[in-house]
UniProtKB/Swiss-Prot annotation:
Belongs to the eukaryotic ribosomal protein eS27 family. Binds 1 zinc ion per subunit. This is Small ribosomal subunit protein eS27. A zinc finger (C4-type) spans 17-39. Pfam families: Ribosomal_S27e. Zn(2+) binds at residues 17, 20, 36, 39. It comes from Methanocorpusculum labreanum (strain ATCC 43576 / DSM 4855 / Z). Its cofactor is Zn(2+). GO terms for molecular function: structural constituent of ribosome; zinc ion binding. The gene is rps27e. HAMAP family: Ribosomal_eS27 (MF_00371).
Amino acid sequence: MVKASRETRSKFLKVKCPDCENEQLVFEKATSVVECTVCGRILAEPTGGKAALKADIVATFE
């Protein structure tokens, strides 16, 4: 019997807002605009694939 291995190709990213230093999780392939929950600055914008990040990546989670 052959087991199909499923690897996730996308990740969650912990990003830091450049304005208020708030850290929050963002999906790497976000399909909608992601805003900072504290100050409202745009952290990620969809591009049809991986999101365009406007914040610093602190950590990655699979």
